[in-house]
Amino acid sequence: VTDAMPPAAVPTSTAPTPTGTAPPGLTSTGTTPAPREYPQALRGPKHRWWRPLVGLGVTVAGLAVVTGALLLSVLAFVIAESMGAELPDPASDAFLVSPAGMLITNLGLALGIPLALLATWAQAGRAGLVSSVLGRVRWRLLLGGLGVALLLLVTLSVGTDILLTQLGFPAGGEDAGTGSSAGSSADETGLWPLTPASGWIALSIVILLTTPLQAAGEEYFFRGWLSQWIGSWLRWRWLAVAVPAVVTGLLFALAHGAQSPWLFADRLVFGLLASLLVWRTGGLEIAVAMHAANNLLAFGLAIAYDELAESLLITEVPPLDGAVSIAITILTGAVLLWWARRHDPDLVVTDPVLPEPMRSGPVAPAAMAPAYAAPGPVAPGPVTPSPVAPRQSAPGAAEDGPANGETT
């Protein structure tokens, strides 16, 4: 038996450590920031107490610009009329329900989209976070949700109208609080005969093209920027979910002006449900789809029965109509949430992990290994085999001699 000698220690060279100052903007500590849900999406690594104030300032300035533009347009109408031009009164119902009036109204409300994007960028540096936690619009959810919402709302609205009529309840008209007499000529199914007003083709085109933008503008402002702005002040998750939902729901309902309790409740429930959809899908897409489908159906029916002015200026609904509308809204939202969750949408913002900030200071020279200890297949002097076999034998080892550390 031969004496075993430990293998010679071979010093390894030490790689130089990068030194110097970090590139501008690289302030990460190397750890992954905690994932954030949509209401707290703006509480990212760059969040500071003053950043929400910047976003608020941009929003106020934007609203001031929009208001000023509207006032200038009204002033232009007044000046043109004083010079003898025959123009419709911009404050009249006739102008409101005209193609030009609907175009101005819808595009004015659609300005909520760029306003929310600009305010979000000013506050967090990522404008797309107001659309979804991925920082972009998820078009599959938006377009698919719009189709599902339209199918649901048409089916439920027509179905309940027929059902209520068969049960002896009024279906629209003066009894429905719209101020029209269409219900007096309703047929046995509860579906009114179509009586579109003149110019309905141009009006339908304007509504079809701009109503989705109008609905998106309201959602981007209320459920988007305003919800995230409130959530950026709140550290606790459940408060950041509940408080923005309640506040924006109330403001959304109040923004529609004077209204009866049932109409206010209907709009409040819609706002609360939209906030739930945004939270549980991680973005605005499903809420925008439900809002756009609801308005497209409402405006489409109003044009078909020449009741667009009554639909836009509605201030009250009877309890039955309000309760039915709330039930349809809740059922539609529940189905949309189920459909969206089947697509497994992202629910949290994930920030990229940045490397550790680089140390500043002189660069240390690399440690050099001595020449006599350089690794190689042959070491100086006689080599005595180790009694410990390697983890994996080289090819042919079994033929060269005993294995598993056996000696003879």
Task: Give the positions of each predicted feature.
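Juxtamembrane helix-loop-helix connectors linking adjacent transmembrane helices
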Residues: 103-106, 129-216, 227-228, 232-233, ...
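Cytoplasmic juxtamembrane regions at transmembrane-helix boundaries
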Residues: 122-143, 223-238, 243, 357-365
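Membrane interfacial helix motifs at helix-loop boundaries and amphipathic/re-entrant anchors
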Residues: 70-105, 158-200, 254-263, 303-323
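Hydrophobic residues within the alpha-helical transmembrane core of Major Facilitator Superfamily
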Residues: 57, 159, 250-251
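N-terminal, membrane-interfacial amphipathic/helix-forming hydrophobic leader that caps
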Residues: 1-125, 131, 315-408
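Membrane-embedded alpha-helical segments of transport systems
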Residues: 61-66, 111, 150-151, 293-298
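Transmembrane helix-loop-helix hairpins at the membrane interface
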Residues: 203-337, 341-357
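Residue-level signature of transmembrane alpha-helical entry/exit and packing/kink sites
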Residues: 51-55, 98-109, 141, 145, ...
